[in-house]
Amino acid sequence: MTVILLRHGVSTSNTARTLAGRAPGVELTERGTEQAAAVADRLAMLPIEHIASSPLLRCQRTVAPLAEKLGLEPDHDERLIEVDYGDWTGRPIAELVTEPLWRIVQGHASGAVFPSGEGLAQVQQRAVAAIRDIERTLAEKAGRDVLWVACAHGDVIKSILADALGLHLDSFQRIAVEPASISVVRYSPHGPSVWKFNDTGADLSALAAAAPTTPTPGGEVPAAANADNGNAGHRDSP
């Protein structure tokens, strides 16, 4: 089973340098809308059979062009929703970096709980559970490997990737997930493997091939050894 983790495109909150959290009405910018269209063009050639998405508007807008091209109805899953940042919601990043909690978020994420909000450990638990549950449901229904998309938010995707990589949550800020980037995780009986990471423009044709059952010796990705692995960006704010 293979999931394409898609972060929403650039939002009005991203450009304003505020922490959107679950605040209503946060739209994509013009650039974010262009990114959503570009992602749809990249992914539409793949045999994607399911789209799950955070219910927040910026994720809905991001997957809409792809869903239209594929003729799929996105499933809005509350477990993929943005972190509940509580009292931090809507505040400028420039203010938040002066808060004592900021250091905990960056270096000891497993112990970070946002005031009147949720903890990052809770976020990882619900997000990973969502991915695994959807994978299981799709596998039982199809009886074979399925390629699907999950559109979510930066910290949510980073927590899923940390789990797939076997990283402790305290290290998840070392993972970069840019707006409209994709990361690809393949789950097998041998465990998860990360095929793409914070990718914003690589060749994805290898994803249309059958999934290998085990990693290839030497670390090469079968049928995609020459594919560009994308560009890692700057470290995300929470």
Feature names for model-found ranges:
Residues 47-55, 142-151:
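Short glycine-rich phosphate-binding loop at a beta-alpha junction
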Residues 65, 159, 163:
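Active-site signature of alpha/beta-hydrolase-fold catalytic machinery across serine-
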Residues 27, 68-129, 186, 196-199, ...:
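Phosphate-handling substructures
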Residues 2, 6-72:
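Active-site-proximal alpha-helix that buttresses catalytic centers in soluble enzyme cores
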Residues 83-94, 140-146, 163-238:
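Acidic, low-complexity terminal tails and accessory targeting/binding regions
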Residues 37-44, 124, 128-139:
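Generic structural signal for well-ordered alpha-helical scaffold segments
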Residues 11, 156-157:
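Short active-site segment of divalent metal-dependent hydrolases/proteases
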